[in-house]
From Swiss-Prot:
EC numbers on record: 2.7.1.48
Binding site residues for ATP: G15, G16, S17, G18, S19, G20, K21, T22
Reactions catalysed according to its record: uridine + ATP = UMP + ADP + H(+); cytidine + ATP = CMP + ADP + H(+)
CDD domains, A to Z: UMPK
Primary localisation category: cytoplasm
Keywords, sorted A to Z: ATP-binding, Cytoplasm, Kinase, Nucleotide-binding, Transferase
Domain of life: Bacteria
Encoding gene per record: udk
Native species: Ligilactobacillus salivarius (strain UCC118)
Protein name: Uridine kinase
Family: Belongs to the uridine kinase family.
Length: 213
């Protein structure tokens, strides 16, 4: 990681679907009051598939590294590190492609980048000050995913189970779990692990203090 005096602090938070990434990220956010904060979702950077027929777009494997426009994500993170405003893409899940609209995002002191594959790409990892892997038992993750997809996304139980078996589980073991070796901190039990969250917040505050000198 290069020396980045007076630059934003970038925290990468990853783990499998339903691991508690968002809970951990929000817990860090809540404890870092007094600093400007930004949460970026890797999901916003799914590829633009507008040139593909809809029948092909619906077959997208969203758990594969090739589903993401990592080059754009790296570029926009570098812009944020230079205190530049970015135009973050917005993904349209109903159309399975990027929306024509964008969201203007201002740089902040602390940037949390959350997603299933944020530790997969070396160029992305190199921009991070702290890399976190949220490690949660497979059974707990699938239960959480079923609850979320049925309650929040209107999915059927069978469709969630089929997707889990065909893509989510194999992609986790092939691409996501191996990135654990790049993590500075592995957080078991997700957002329930208050000790790990307290340690993370202390470390972030320490980095911020050093950059303010």
């Amino acid at each position: 990681m290069a020396n980045r005096e007076n630059k934003p602090v970038i925290i990468g938070v990853t783990g499998g679907s339903g691991s508690g990434k968002t809970t951990v990220s929000r817990a860090i956010f809540e404890q870092l009051h007094g600093h400007s904060l930004l949460m970026l979702q890797e999901d916003s950077y799914y590829n633009d598939q507008s040139d593909m027929p809809f029948e092909e777009r619906i077959k997208t494997n969203y758990d594969h590294p090739n589903a993401f426009d990592t080059e754009l994500l790296v570029k926009q993170l570098k812009d944020l590190l230079d205190w530049k405003t970015i135009e973050k893409p917005i993904y349209d899940y109903t159309e399975h492609t990027r929306s024509s609209e964008v969201e203007k995002v201002e740089p902040k002191e602390v940037i949390i980048l959350e997603g299933i594959l944020v530790l997969n790409d070396p160029a992305l990892r190199d921009l991070m000050d702290i890399k976190i892997f949220v490690d949660t038992d497979d059974d707990i993750r699938i239960i959480r995913r079923i609850q979320r997809d049925i309650e929040e996304r209107g999915r059927s139980l069978q469709s969630v189970i089929d997707q889990y078996k065909s893509t989510v589980k194999p992609m986790y073991h092939q691409f996501i779990e191996p990135t654990k070796r790049y993590a500075d901190i592995i957080v078991p039990e997700g957002g329930e692990n208050q000790v790990a969250i307290d340690l993370l917040v202390t470390k972030v505050r320490d980095i911020l203090r050093k950059r303010e000198k």
